[in-house]
A protein has these predicted regions:
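Metal-dependent phosphoesterase core characteristic of DEDDh/y 3'-5' exonuclease domains
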Residues: 1-17, 35-140, 144-167, 178, ...
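Glycine/proline-rich loop-helix segments at beta-alpha junctions forming the active-site rim
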Residues: 172
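Short, basic/hydrophobic alpha-helical segments
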Residues: 20-34
């Protein structure tokens, strides 16, 4: 989800409408235009490397994603590359105390916290979705992961003391309301 002045938004770039190069270019341009905080579950170990290798394949550029203070001095101490900074929060890595032995599956933690989890899906289906060009199934699967990550992130903010219980509940309800409006 994207959270800004207009509220919560969830949108996807699907190969049903765009090429892989267009999807990657749109995604990477967000870092140059908006400088968002990136929240992921295992994003440092899996998602970002895959995205970046595919971006290299397509000859794309992502200067803001790699900037460690050369372009923007504020990124010297808060950038996307350093796992201990907060420009990119890999919630799985943080909750594992940056120790790979403690990594947990998104589905397990989502279900443990009472969130939907993967609803019977798994990442093992992804190659088949791509091979058979089942873009809607792939998009739905990825959006489910994004929503579970968002809900876990909200719970993490509560754990950290950055959200009060009533604020946490408001965000959960706002997310549910948003999803109901979209369906």
């Amino acid at each position: 989800p994207i959270l800004d002045e207009q509220g919560l938004k969830l949108f996807s770039f699907s190969q049903e409408h765009y090429s892989e190069a267009e999807i990657l270019a749109k995604f990477l341009s967000i870092f140059d235009k908006r400088h968002p905080n990136l929240v992921s579950w295992n994003g440092s170990q899996f998602d970002l490397p895959v995205i970046l290798f595919r971006a290299m394949y397509h000859g794309l550029s992502a200067p803001s994603l790699f900037d460690q203070g050369e372009l923007d001095t504020q990124k010297r101490y808060n950038n996307y590359q350093n796992r201990y900074h907060h420009r990119h929060i890999d919630v799985m890595d943080v909750m594992a105390m940056f120790n790979g032995r403690n990594f947990q599956k998104l589905d397990d933690i989502a279900c443990l916290l009472g969130f939907p989890g993967k609803r019977g899906e798994s990442g093992y289906h992804i190659p088949s979705y791509v091979q058979h060009e089942q873009w809607l199934k792939l998009t739905s699967y990825c959006e489910g992961d994004v929503l579970n990550t968002w809900l876990i992130y909200l719970r993490w903010l509560l754990l950290k003391g950055q959200l009060l219980p009533q604020d946490h509940e408001q965000w959960i309800q706002a997310t549910i309301h948003y999803l109901q409006q979209q369906s």
